[in-house]
């Protein structure tokens, strides 16, 4: 039950913060691209502490007060049903990985994009009403 996905933020020291979304799989690459686009447009992509918080906030959205649905881990994947996109602050690249969620680790890299390539390919225009 669910559509489990993880999003990775590789820190300058090599550690990876993973954001787990229990129902985040549908449109996950667009969600991640929109979050990265937002933080880049805000001028905070080079400020890792702020960028981490902004990206996580964009992914979680209005669900902050809930007790289910989202989690955060460091260097360990939570339950997962999809490929895992990881943004690397040092290289400004997004790599899509295979993952072994039973072991909690990333395995093979599939494809790597520059930050702007990833945003152009996957970001969706969001219209507020």
What residues fall within each predicted segment?
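Low-complexity intrinsically disordered segments
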Residues: 36-129
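Short, flexible N-terminal segments of the mature chain
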Residues: 15-51
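Short acidic-glycine loop/turn motifs at beta-strand connectors
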Residues: 10-15, 89-91
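Short beta-strand scaffold segments in enzyme catalytic cores
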Residues: 4-9
């Amino acid at each position: 039950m669910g559509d489990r996905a993880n999003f990775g933020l590789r820190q300058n020291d090599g550690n990876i913060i993973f954001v787990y979304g229990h129902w985040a799989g549908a449109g996950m690459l667009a969600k991640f691209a929109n979050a990265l686009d937002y933080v880049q447009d805000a001028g905070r992509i080079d400020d890792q502490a702020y960028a981490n918080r902004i990206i996580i906030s964009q992914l979680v959205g209005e669900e902050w007060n809930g007790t289910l649905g989202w989690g955060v881990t460091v260097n360990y994947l939570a339950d997962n049903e999809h490929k895992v996109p990881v943004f690397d602050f040092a290289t400004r690249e997004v790599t899509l990985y295979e993952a072994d969620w039973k072991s909690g680790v990333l395995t093979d890299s599939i494809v790597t994009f520059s930050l702007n390539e990833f945003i152009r390919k996957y970001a969706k225009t969001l219209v507020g009403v």
